[in-house]
Amino acid sequence: MGGLTLFAAQGCKAPKQVAEQAEHPNIIYVFPDQYRNQAMGFWNQEGFRDKVNFRGDPVHTPNIDTFARESMVLTSAQSNCPLSSPHRGMLLTGMYPNRSGVPLNCNSTRPISSLRDDAECIGDVFSKAGYDCAYFGKLHADFPTPNDPENPGQYVETQRPVWDAYTPKEQRHGFNYWYSYGTFDEHKNPHYWDTDGKRHDPKEWSPLHESGKVVSYLKNEGNVRDTKKPFFIMVGMNPPHSPYRSLNDCEEQDFNLYKDQPLDSLLIRPNVDLNMKKAESVRYYFASVTGVDRAFGQILEALKQLGLDKNTVVIFASDHGETMCSQRTDDPKNSPYSESMNIPFLVRFPGKIQPRVDDLLLSAPDIMPTVLGLCGLGDSIPSEVQGRNFAPLFFDEKAEIVRPAGALYIQNLDGEKDKDGLVQSYFPSSRGIKTARYTLALYIDRKTKQLKKSLLFDDVNDPYQLNNLPLDENKEVVEQLYREMGTMLKEIDDPWYTEKILSDRIPY
């Protein structure tokens, strides 16, 4: 297990806490940042490799691999707007970026991008249902304001624009236990604000520190939770998010697994450019992947030792992926490429969810209602939620439920700015759709809002998206994709629908 001793002596087992099992199960949602679906070792193992048409990354993830064999594993979960804050807005609210309040990455120049105070978020629902709710790690869903609890009237950091943020109690949406921050990318020098607003600077690689705090919470050290209630835990780990360029960013024992490996044995995807400067980063990225696996394993082991594993739904996911030299792009995310959009989504619920692999096209706004459904709270899903509850499918693979035809792709950029440089609107630069077979993305000109670029890939015959198909040579396919995309954009009241963008092509 490395990095954390769960219990002092082998002969001293922790007290079983089965007595606290309630009508509703416990739930733990772990979502490391920028963790792509391909970066899990089990994809290269028997029982999994024949379920996908890509090669998994050569990563060491023993805990996730074991967990996968106990879980329902999705091959095609999608981060519809594959960027930190917009995904988190969708995750927490069950709404797309135009409704969640978070269309852009949150920083102090973007007052228009912040989680809505009036939204009924996933923590609100669990709290009202009698859960003890705890949030650990990165949040990155709030507009930073000068509200440093230790320095009133000041921001929590001096750099401009301000990215990091303190979330006061009235904005925590049902989470009664808090050990979190906005966003901060010094992985071995993290900081957190606790429930009472006190800052902690642990000087420890952040995923391992967070897993230790989760274990402490599970063991109820310091009497921090009500053991008569079921718990809902979210763990937002920052790695393997960049930076990934030195041992300041990962644990040396994890880096040692990759440091002597040739780059072409690590970056194995056919769409990779090994000549990119970023290529050397793969060793550190994979090291962080392995470190996250170790931290995740510590949480799983604690559940088992405490007798909580049988009545706890555990989900492993991410907010978006990482291109890592694929498609010759320096942008690790915010694109329709599979390395960016396709995220892990593994769900374990012993005795309730049969371990298997499924190709459900799960969208980010579907996660909140589905998680509530898994816990028997389907009737408590807020009316504003735009996502769908797919819990019946998790419980029964033969459930009569209409599967989604596709998942939307959304990219927004900064729009108009005021005289102080504050962003007052967002520009809906691209929309697209991912279906079981195709990926389509349309990009528009900022001034004319006319089509300036398109991407169309046959993901079945071209899984690494090497061949961008011309729209005019694939009219029948494109028209069907336009119809499906238009229907979905209309359903969520997206700006492309309200402004009738590219209405000469898309039949809204």
UniProtKB/Swiss-Prot annotation:
GO terms for molecular function: arylsulfatase activity. The conversion to 3-oxoalanine (also known as C-formylglycine, FGly), of a serine or cysteine residue in prokaryotes and of a cysteine residue in eukaryotes, is critical for catalytic activity. The modification 3-oxoalanine (Ser) is found at S84. It is an enzyme of class 3 (hydrolase). Its EC number is 3.1.6.-. CDD domains: sulfatase_like. The keyword Hydrolase applies. Transmembrane segments: none annotated. Endosulfatase involved in the degradation of the glycosaminoglycans (GAGs) chondroitin sulfate (CS) and dermatan sulfate (DS). Efficiently hydrolyzes sulfate groups from a broad range of substrate size, including disaccharide to high molecular weight CS and DS polymers. Has a strict specificity for the 4-O-sulfate groups of galactosamine. GAG-specific sulfatases play a key role in the persistence of the major human gut symbiont B.thetaiotaomicron in the host gastrointestinal tract. PANTHER family: ARYLSULFATASE FAMILY MEMBER, ENDO-4-O-SULFATASE. Belongs to the sulfatase family. This is Endo-4-O-sulfatase.
